[in-house]
Amino acid sequence: EKRALGRKYVAKYIKVKPHILQKVSDFQAKYLENTYSIGVHIRGTDFSYAKPTSPETYIEAIHHHLDENKIKEFNLFLATDQVQFIEVFEKEFPGRVSYYNAIRSENHVAPFHFKDVNNYKKGEDVLIDMLLLSNCQFLFKGAAAVGEYALWLNPTLSCYDFALESDIERGRYSLRKGAFFKIDLGDKGSMKLKITYIQQVFRQILEQVKLIFEKDHD
């Protein structure tokens, strides 16, 4: 199983640097200690290789978990690349949501594509999110890597895995719509974003045609 193999290699080869662990420890001491901690990883932006799970689906599952286990006091750590998701979860769980000061996006462009952000900062943010998720007492995750890696970092972490309910998207990757376009996030400046999406797809089609043309003329 991939997860078992991942846990084996993480335990054997991955050693997190002390200054990263200190940042994790400081955040955890401030927001997640002395109460039941729930980790949530939810992808937005350009996520497209599987059907995205909506915030409403997460929230319903979280309430069910709390009710089933009679949990009254808890804190929720949210790891996400989409700014709008923070607003949704804070509205549903006021005063209980924490999140690391990571790079996030307000649209369909994933933060790791941001050219004006230092690449080390991008990587550090994701690593800290993974470590904080792994230190929670229960995890809700979708079909994306960060939540999965949290399970590799902590083999005893219990979770609800929406990936088991999420269909893999078929067809050419460059033509798929990302989660930002598929999930209802309120006003997105829809016309401008639709034009941006069409332009993005058109550019990718041109790149594919160019590659085919160059291959045929080698």
Q: Where would I find each of the regions flagged by the language model?
A:
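A donor-sugar binding/catalytic signature common to diverse glycosyltransferases
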Residues: 126-170
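Secretory-pathway luminal glycosyltransferase catalytic domains
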Residues: 1-73, 207
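Catalytic donor nucleotide-activated moiety binding site of glycosyltransferases and closely related
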Residues: 41-45, 69-119
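A generic structural motif
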Residues: 97-108, 160-177
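Membrane-proximal basic amphipathic "stem/tether" segments
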Residues: 171-218
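Hydrophobic beta-strand segments of well-ordered beta-sheets in folded domains
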Residues: 38, 73-76, 97, 136-139, ...
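A short acidic (Asp/Glu
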Residues: 50-52, 86-91, 151-153
